[in-house]
């Protein structure tokens, strides 16, 4: 079973995340941030990864700590669930359309955390959610999942559509990259014999 549960508690947030990489896309998300919950629901649905997130944070200040800390915990959960990464497909990429928006997302489950994020949002907020937090979440996730992740919105006019295309794009590449490659015979997909470093 490729599952993991991460609990993270700081003075700012208390978070519990559970993932099942071989799930059906079921989700149970409660962060107290409506738009963010919507994005995480999409992530679960389109990745086919079961995701449970329970987060209590200092939302009376702003959404930054909760958003970032959920990214940290979810990244850690995915990394833990992958184990030694034997047999995974490892690489995946997609061009993901969302109406007038087109975003390219490419992933390498490399064990070498890197984020290249190029998306410009026409507005500073989507509802009450600061659009700059989209990048913050992706950075926290990539650094803690140990993945190389490139996210680039090629064009788009609607901030909601841009954010949604980024999350859906990540979902689809995660789905492909964590999948077991039947031809790999359980081998780690690296000439080094291990991933990371």
Swiss-Prot record:
Principal location: cytoplasm
Catalyzed chemical reaction(s): D-erythro-1-(imidazol-4-yl)glycerol 3-phosphate = 3-(imidazol-4-yl)-2-oxopropyl phosphate + H2O
GO molecular function: imidazoleglycerol-phosphate dehydratase activity
DNA-binding as UniProt keyword: no
Pfam family, one: IGPD
Keyword Lyase applies: yes
EC id: 4.2.1.19
GO biological process: L-histidine biosynthetic process
Database matches in SUPFAM superfamilies: Ribosomal protein S5 domain 2-like
InterPro entries with a match to the protein in the record: IGPD_sf, ImidazoleglycerolP_deHydtase, ImidazoleglycerP_deHydtase_CS, Ribosomal_Su5_D2-typ_SF
GO CC, one annotated term: cytoplasm
UniProtKB keywords: Amino-acid biosynthesis, Cytoplasm, Histidine biosynthesis, Lyase
UniProt xrefs under Gene3D superfamilies: Imidazole glycerol phosphate dehydratase, domain 1
Subcellular location: Cytoplasm
Family, per entry: Belongs to the imidazoleglycerol-phosphate dehydratase family.
PANTHER family: IMIDAZOLEGLYCEROL-PHOSPHATE DEHYDRATASE (PTHR23133:SF2), IMIDAZOLEGLYCEROL-PHOSPHATE DEHYDRATASE HIS7 (PTHR23133)
Protein's name according to its UniProt entry: Imidazoleglycerol-phosphate dehydratase
Gene: hisB
